[in-house]
Amino acid sequence: DKGFFAEENLQVEPQWFDAAHPIAVATASSQVDVGATGITASLFNMAASGQKLAIVADKGREQKGYSSSALIVTADNYANGVTSLEALKGKRIGITQKGSTFHYMIGRMLETKGMKLDDVQLIPLGKLSAVMAALESKQIDAAILNEPNISKVQRAGYGKMVVQVGDLIPYQTSAVFYSPNFVKNEDVAVRFMKAYNKAVNYYYDAAIAKKDAKQLAE
């Protein structure tokens, strides 16, 4: 904690969720003030049904040349030649939930090779930790993971990277949202965003300078 939020006289209490959809629901219903999560199909469905929340800042995007999300296959599959999207045909692909950003990513990536989702077996596992566990135990053949999970899996030795998502389909994956109640409090909302921007700039500058690597990874 670098004290950026305290500098703006804000006390932040993180609440953790297992997947993107519950975060959007909690934010739209003002159970939490601020949400940071993927821009998913369920989010658009909520907006279409009249539920309100405000997208206020970038959280993450896929861009060529930058490590964000990637297709990871089990080490055994990689050793046996599953080193391309085309080689995924008939394979079991782990995702968190249907309609998630990972679901969208694999569909779009397959399209770049003239393939469809029907060419693979999608296995919804509910949460990212379950996807990683299934990859390690070889209950699935591949998955889309994001950082720092990509690095964790590769260091552990049970997964190999095939391709970065951003190298094939640049797009906005996630954002910061304000709840309907929180967005009405302009003073607090602005102060929160100032603190958030300070934190993002610290992270970016430290990463570029390769400082505080352990803390950034954690």
Where are these predicted regions, by residue range?
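Short, glycine-/small- and polar/acidic-enriched structural segments
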Residues: D1-K116, Q121-L125, D141-E147, Q164, ...
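Pocket-lining segment of extracytoplasmic ligand-binding domains
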Residues: N77, A130-A217
